[in-house]
C-alpha cells in the first residue's frame, strides 16, 4: 500500500477495510457489500491504489462479475502485477481461458513482466487451449525474467508442453528441473509409453532410481495404460513382468490395464498366470478385473474361459455383460450372444450404448447383417443414442448386404448429431458407399472430411480397387504420398489388387518392390496373392507359379486360390490340378475348389474328369454352396436363393424371365451351357441357368421398383459367365443401371456394357 494513498484509506470506514482484507470475504460476503465497498472507495478517492483495486477485482470475480472486475482494472492509471494477476487467476479458475490470455496481453503491453505467481496460471491456460505457440512465447518471457528455473514455473511449463503434445520441449524442461517429483516423472513415463518408447521409459526409470525418486503403483499403472492405449501390447506385458520382479503388488488397476494387451497379443498362458494371481489376491469380485479377464479370454479364443468367468460373477453388471457379449461374438457364437442379450433385456438390466454397440458389432461381424440393422432401430426406439462407435459398427452391415437406404439413413443421423468429423465414422461411410456401388459418394464423403487418417485413405483406395478403377487408386496413392502419412501394408494391398483387376503388370511389380525397398514393408500373404492374381490374369501363369515357389513362407489357400482362378481364365489344366491339390490339402472341406476345378475340366470338354470330381465330392459329403443374392427394395432387404420356387412372386419372376429370354434370342444371344450340368437335357440346362440367384434378384428388382431405378445386388459366389451376359442385356433392354457385387469385385452394368470389360 503506497504512502500517498494512506491518508485516503483512513477516510474509508474501518468496516469496509476489514471487509476487503478479510480472508473469508470470498465465501461469506455478498455482491451488494462489494458494490457498497466500491462506492465508498470511489468516494474516498482510494480507487487508484493497486492493493485496494486488486481486492475489489477479486471480490467481483468471486461472483463471476468479470466485466465489473475488468472495469476496476481499466480504471487504475498505473495497474500493478498484483491487479492483473488477480483477474488472470479468477478467469483461469472460471475456465475463461481465452479472456485470461487477453488480460495477459494487456498486462504485457503495460510493460509488466509476469511473476512466479502469474506464470503457472498462464501455462495452465495454454495447456487447456492447446495454445503451444502462446505457451512458447510465455516460456521466453520466463527465461528473460529469470523465472524459468523456479520449481512451480517449471512444473506448470512441463505440463503445458505435455498437454500440447510437444514431447521434445517437455523433455528439455524436465531435464533442467532441479526439483523433480514422482508426479512429474509419472506424467513423462505415461507419455513415452503412449508413444511406445520402451527405451525412454526404462531410461527415465533409471534416472528416477539414481535421483532417489521411487516409482509408485500409480506410475506403473500409467505406463501400462499408455502402452495399452497406443497399441504397444508386448511392451505393456514386458513392463508388467518388470513390476512383478521389482516386488510391487499389482492392484486391480494394474491388472485391468495389462489384460487388454495380453489379449491382443494372444498370450493365453500369460493370461492364465494373471488369472491365478487375481484369484490369489481376491480380485475376482472387481467388475473391471472380471470384464478385462473375459475380454482377454475372448481375444485369445478361449471360449470356456469366457463362459466360466461370467458364470462365476454373481452380479449382473453392464460392463461385464458387454465384455461377455463381445467375447462370444468374437468367437463366432453370435447366436449365444443374441440369446444372452435378450436375457439381459428381460431382466430389465440397464443396457447402455456400449451394450447395444457390442451386440450390433457382433452381428455385423458374423453375417447377421439384417439382425444388426434391426437392433440399431430397436436401440433408438429404446431411447439409447448411438455414438461415434455405434455408427462404424453398424455401417458394415449396410455394406455387406447393400442396404443403401439404411446406410443413407445412418449417414443422415450422423450429420444430425455432428459425428461426421470423426475419422472412424467417415471411414465407415466411405466403405459402406463403396460396397453399395456408390463409389462417387465415397469420394464426396472423403473430400468433406476435415481430418483424414490412414484408415480413411485406405478405405477410399480399397473402394476404388473393388470397382476395378486402377487409375483412380494410383492417383489417390500419389496424393497420399504428398501428405505426412506413410502407406502401410493395407495401402499396398489395394494398389496391387487394383492393378490385378485391369492387368497392369508393370505397375504391379513397381508397387510390389516399392513397399519393401522404399517403405520397409515386408510383403505378406495377401500381397503375394494379389501378384499371383495379377500375373495369372495377364496370362503369365508360369511366372505366377514361379513366384509362389520363391515365397519366403508357405503359401496359403488365398495364394493357391488365386492361381486356380487364373487357370480358369487361361484354360490351363496342368497348373490348375497342381493348385487344386494344394487346396484339397489346405481346405479339404471347401466345395468351391472342387467346383472350380470341375468348371475348368468342363470348359476343356473333359467330362470324365468332371464326373470324377463330382463323385469325389459325394464321397466326402460335400455339396456346392447354394447361390444366394440380396437386393434392397423400399428399405427392405430381400434374400433370393438359386432355384428357389417358393418365392411369393415366382410366377411373375418366371413370366418376366421368359420375356427377357425371348428378346435375347431375337438379338442372337444363346445361353452359355458351360455353366450348367452337362448330363441333363438342354432345356433343363437353360432352366437351371435362369434359376441362378443373381438373375432372380435382378428380375425381382425390375418388378418391384419404378422404371429407371438403379438395382443393387450382392451375391455370395462369383458371378457366372451366363449371368454376366444376361445382366448386360437387361441393363440395355430395361434401361437400368445394375450393380452386382460378387466375391471377387464389383460389376457396374449400364447400356449393355460392364465395368469389368468382361474380364473377371
From Swiss-Prot:
GO molecular function: RNA binding; zinc ion binding
Chain spans, region Type E motif: 559-634
Gene3D superfamilies registered for this protein in UniProt: Tetratricopeptide repeat domain
One BP term from GO: RNA modification
Annotated region described as Type DYW motif, given as residue ranges: 666-760
Ranges for region Type E(+) motif: 635-665
PROSITE patterns: PPR
Record-linked InterPro entries: DYW_dom, E_motif, Eplus_motif, Pentatricopeptide_rpt, PPR_At4g14850-like_plant, TPR-like_helical_dom_sf
KW Repeat (keyword) present: yes
Repeat region (PPR), residues: 49-79, 80-114, 115-149, 150-180, 181-215, 216-250, 251-285, 286-316, 317-351, 352-386, 387-421, 422-452, 453-487, 488-523, 524-554
Entry keyword annotation includes Secreted: no
Keywords (A to Z) from UniProt: Repeat
Family: Belongs to the PPR family. PCMP-H subfamily.
Record's protein name: Pentatricopeptide repeat-containing protein At1g20230
Species for this entry: Arabidopsis thaliana
Record lineage: Eukaryota, Viridiplantae, Streptophyta, Embryophyta, Tracheophyta
